[in-house]
Regions:
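Non-catalytic cap/lid and distal C-terminal segments of serine-dependent acyl enzymes
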Residues: 1-244
Length: 244
């Protein structure tokens, strides 16, 4: 199809989108279950909640200077959805994948299929909703684009204890049995979890991660934000036991 340059609108030029085969239910595949709970920012010592929108500002407020964004306290609630594979035996340390920007509606089906085909081990998936907003000055940006192990600390000390308490699972402490996964800012967050805490995570799925300078506030140790990984951190440090 060759639409005229004088016409505005949407044009379907193909090819047709074909869903991945992992999204098609496998006949006879055992189905895991999911549990859901809510976390309140008031209960968090690590991420009590921020926003870049002034209390009297419009919802679509854009800070005038993204290199120095003012922030304001803001409470939030986040949903955590936990996938538990079929046949899981309570008390058994389970491999785990931590998924940013959760909950993910397709992941339980994908894991059912992959586990049934023996392509991945039976694992628990912890799908964590971000704290809201996006980019510099937002709670999501603080959690995901900060160049530190702070988010991994949050998962370890505040999320995992609730997962084990509320969902009746035991999470493995073996870093080889732990993975972090994310897209965009969630992608760099997944990598940072392993980079700063390789004793906790050794496997990473990072899709279209924001390896650019979105960190806010600026840290003098990593002034270029996510650029620091390919600019300085990876080439100037010993190889880490991380599979990406």
């Amino acid at each position: 199809m060759n639409p005229s340059s004088n016409i505005d609108g949407d044009f379907l030029i193909g090819p047709d989108y074909i869903p991945a085969p992992e999204l098609t239910p496998v006949s006879g595949a055992p189905k895991g279950k999911t549990e859901t709970f809510i976390m309140n920012s008031a209960d968090s010592k690590i991420f009590p909640g921020i926003t870049k929108v002034p209390p009297d500002g419009p919802a679509n407020y854009v800070p005038p200077d993204l290199t120095n964004v003012a922030t304001y306290p803001k409470a939030y609630k986040r949903t955590v959805k936990v996938y538990i594979p079929a046949g899981y035996v309570a008390g058994t340390p389970a491999p785990v994948i931590v998924v940013q920007d959760g909950p993910d509606k397709n992941l339980p089906l994908v894991l059912d299929n992959l586990i049934a085909r023996h392509r991945v081990p039976a694992m628990v998936a912890v799908m964590i909703q971000n704290g809201g907003g996006d980019a510099q000055g937002s709670e999501r940006g603080l959690e995901y684009d900060t160049m530190s192990g702070r988010y991994a600390d949050f998962v370890e000390s505040e999320v995992f204890p609730l997962v084990e308490k509320n969902c009746g699972v035991t999470i493995s402490h073996d870093p080889e049995a732990r993975a972090a996964m994310g897209i965009s800012s969630g992608g760099i967050a997944a990598f940072s979890m392993a980079w700063y805490h390789p004793e906790l995570y050794r496997r990473v799925i990072t899709y279209s991660g924001t390896y650019v300078n979105q960190a806010s506030p600026t840290d003098p140790k990593t002034p270029h934000g996510g650029w620091e990984y390919h600019e300085h951190l990876i080439p100037q440090n010993p190889t880490k036991p991380i599979r990406v």
